[in-house]
Swiss-Prot record:
Pfam families: TetR_C_46, TetR_N
Protein name in UniProt: HTH-type transcriptional activator FasR
UniProt DNA-binding residue ranges: 52-71
Species, as recorded: Mycolicibacterium smegmatis (strain ATCC 700084 / mc(2)155) (Mycobacterium smegmatis)
Keywords assigned by UniProt, alphabetized: Activator, DNA-binding, Transcription, Transcription regulation
PROSITE patterns the UniProt entry points to: HTH_TETR_2 (PS50977)
Subunit structure: Homodimer.
Activity regulation remarks: FasR:DNA binding is regulated by long-chain acyl-CoAs (C14- to C26-CoA), which act as effector molecules that modulate the affinity of FasR for its DNA binding sequences and therefore modulate the expression of the essential fas-acpS operon.
Coiled coil: none
InterPro entries named among the record's database cross-references: DesT_TetR_C, Homeodomain-like_sf, HTH-type_TetR-like_transc_reg, HTH_TetR, Tet_transcr_reg_TetR-rel_C_sf
Molecular function per GO: DNA-binding transcription factor activity; transcription cis-regulatory region binding
Reported function: Transcriptional activator that plays a central role in sensing mycobacterial long-chain fatty acids and regulating lipid biosynthesis. Activates the expression of the genes encoding the fatty acid synthase (fas) and the 4-phosphopantetheinyl transferase (acpS), whose products are involved in the fatty acid and mycolic acid biosynthesis. Specifically binds to three conserved operator sequences present in the fas-acpS promoter region. Essential for M.smegmatis viability.
Record region (Disordered): 1-30
Positions of the HTH tetR-type domain: 29-89
Length: 219
């Protein structure tokens, strides 16, 4: 680490996201990723309304004109940050549901996917489920897409593995996702009062108590 970086660290100053100093030239995709990381940190720390493009550019170690070369407005930047986290969450849930054909284990995998997302991307979880800008239609739409995509993944499995008609299967899927989201949120916001495995298992036991009565063709 350079003397300048050491000095900044001793003073408690934050280094630019990605560790790049202002002025370093990066490939466009790499620079965009760096900006999204910095913006995510600032939006979580400050909220949408209090966050400023100056602060985001400074956190990323770039000038504000460079930031505007990639994102024409704060809303566009916020939506790009949100989409990145949404993609990670939905991908994790879908992948979890493909890990086994045992329905109880599949339920556990789905619940655990939400807790894993919190554990590895708490910034993303807060932006999706606790953001302060859901009154903006485009933001609300993206949050809705995230929830519905997770619900759709669960619904597809319930529909395929049971004789339930579509509306009943979807209501169950909506309930399972809501239980997972709220349990994981409680766990995060209360400083993880129990270990993750215990939190996941408790949520699964509660959900399975109802799901076990659904006439599944595979168990």
């Amino acid at each position: 680490m350079s003397d300048l970086a050491n000095t900044a660290e001793r003073r408690g100053e934050k280094r630019p996201a990605g560790g790049n100093r202002r002025g370093n030239r990066l490939p466009r995709d790499e620079r965009r990723g760096q900006l999204l990381i910095a913006a995510s940190e600032v939006f979580v720390d400050r909220g949408y309304h209090a966050a400023g493009m100056d602060e985001i550019a400074d956190r990323a170690g770039v000038s504000k004109p460079v930031l505007y070369q990639h994102f024409s407005s704060k809303l566009e930047l916020y939506l790009a940050v949100l989409q990145r986290h949404v993609d990670n969450l939905v991908s994790g849930v879908r992948q979890a549901l493909r890990t086994t054909t045992d329905n109880r284990q599949r339920l556990r995998a789905a619940v655990e996917a939400f807790f894993d997302f919190i554990e590895h991307d708490s910034q993303g979880y807060r932006l999706i489920f606790e953001n302060d800008y859901v009154t903006e239609p485009q933001v609300a739409a993206q949050v809705k897409v995230a929830t519905e995509a997770c619900t759709d993944a669960v619904f597809d499995l319930i529909s395929r593995d049971s004789g339930l008609e579509a509306h009943r299967a979807r209501m169950i899927a909506v309930g399972l996702v809501a239980i997972s989201v709220d349990s994981a949120r409680y766990w995060l916001n209360n400083d993880r009062p129990i270990d993750k495995d215990s939190a996941v298992e408790g949520t699964v036991q509660f959900a399975w108590g109802g799901l076990s009565h659904v006439p599944l063709t595979r168990s």
